[in-house]
């Protein structure tokens, strides 16, 4: 058994929370192990002037950490699973999916105003095409403004009056103790989350069996089934850039239910579908369900929506 572990992480407040959480959870099971953090600056932390939709977000927050992992400078990497591309580099694997936090998105607004009550043409900040598409489908008048930077930076921009409202993931807001700023938590029938939202993905080298065995103890089986189904759906649909896709799976007593959304950026076209599979006994079967739902969405016309978006990537 290893006596030391080095965790690779970004240096943003949320990333540090995630790494410290992982360290603390591992220490509960391995109290004598020395666990340290190595901070890595990623491309996504540096390129803050352009919208994610223009530069693409495939691995922007993970590739640089993965280089350290492949170079054996760290033993594991802790990511927000929603930032992890659905195909990991050769030699690396997502070994553990931590128990998921609430997957919903939230509205932060002046005076606690809810989405439906925001004034006409309100300035709404989000960097996500997924959120933009679903927002515009219910509030086509909104003036969508791009926002980048860590959570603290976004709250500062909001407090400085740059926007009337902004949309964030509940998980990050809760983890950094900003819950008292939430104006509204949006239900899944209005806003499906990003694939893997709310979960952490712990990445290791495939050939590092000792580390894989150590961190596997943090794996949450239900979360793994759900996230592997969602990631399989996204992998089957995606073509290498940020696109408006949302998904949310639940799993209980062998039954997986997966909801998914594909929409146009302007919110005028939205496809939703769902699938339920029973008797599942392996995460691989959950992935098969994700692929099956992706195929149904393609039959509905998702391919036409996605090909149009990819032309602008």
Swiss-Prot record:
PROSITE patterns: PORPHOBILINOGEN_DEAM (PS00533). It comes from Chlorobium chlorochromatii (strain CaD3). Pathway: Porphyrin-containing compound metabolism; protoporphyrin-IX biosynthesis; coproporphyrinogen-III from 5-aminolevulinate: step 2/4; Porphyrin-containing compound metabolism; chlorophyll biosynthesis. One of its GO terms (cellular component) is cytoplasm. Monomer. The modification S-(dipyrrolylmethanemethyl)cysteine is found at residue 241. GO terms for biological process: chlorophyll biosynthetic process; protoporphyrinogen IX biosynthetic process. The gene is hemC. Pfam families: Porphobil_deam (PF01379), Porphobil_deamC (PF03900). Its EC number is 2.5.1.61. NCBIfam families: hemC. This is Porphobilinogen deaminase. Tetrapolymerization of the monopyrrole PBG into the hydroxymethylbilane pre-uroporphyrinogen in several discrete steps. InterPro entries: HemC, Porphobilin_deaminase_cofac_BS, Porphobilin_deaminase_N, Porphobilinogen_deaminase_C, Porphobilinogen_deaminase_C_sf. Belongs to the HMBS family. It comes from the Bacteria. One of its GO terms (molecular function) is hydroxymethylbilane synthase activity. Keywords: Chlorophyll biosynthesis, Porphyrin biosynthesis, Transferase. CDD domains: PBP2_EcHMBS_like.
């Amino acid at each position: 058994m290893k006596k030391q572990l080095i965790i690779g992480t970004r240096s943003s407040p949320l990333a540090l929370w995630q790494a410290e959480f992982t360290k603390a959870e591992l220490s509960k099971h391995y109290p004598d192990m020395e666990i340290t953090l190595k901070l890595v600056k990623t491309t996504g932390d540096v390129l803050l002037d352009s919208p994610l939709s223009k530069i693409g977000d495939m691995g922007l927050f993970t590739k640089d950490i993965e280089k350290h992992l492949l170079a054996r400078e760290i033993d594991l990497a802790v990511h927000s699973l929603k930032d992890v591309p659905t195909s990991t580099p050769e030699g690396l694997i997502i070994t553990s999916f931590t128990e998921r936090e609430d997957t919903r998105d939230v509205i932060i607004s002046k005076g606690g105003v809810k989405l439906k009550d925001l004034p006409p043409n309100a300035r709404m900040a989000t960097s996500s095409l997924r959120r933009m598409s679903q927002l515009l489908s219910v509030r086509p008048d909104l003036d969508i403004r791009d926002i980048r930077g860590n959570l603290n930076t976004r709250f500062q921009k909001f407090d400085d009056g740059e926007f009337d409202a902004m949309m964030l993931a509940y998980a990050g807001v809760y983890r950094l103790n900003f819950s008292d700023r939430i104006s509204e938590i949006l239900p899944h029938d209005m806003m499906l989350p990003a694939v893997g939202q709310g979960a952490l993905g712990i990445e290791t080298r495939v050939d590092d069996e000792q580390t894989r065995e150590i961190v596997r103890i943090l794996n949450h089986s239900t979360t793994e089934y759900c996230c592997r189904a969602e990631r399989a759906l996204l992998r089957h649909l995606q073509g290498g850039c940020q696109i408006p896709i949302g998904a949310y799976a639940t799993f209980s007593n062998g039954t997986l239910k997966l909801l998914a959304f594909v929409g146009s950026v302007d919110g005028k076209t939205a496809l939703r579908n769902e699938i339920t599979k029973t008797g599942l006994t392996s995460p691989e079967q959950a992935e098969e369900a994700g692929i099956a739902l992706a195929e149904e969405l393609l039959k509905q016309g998702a391919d036409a929506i996605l090909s149009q978006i990819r032309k602008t990537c």
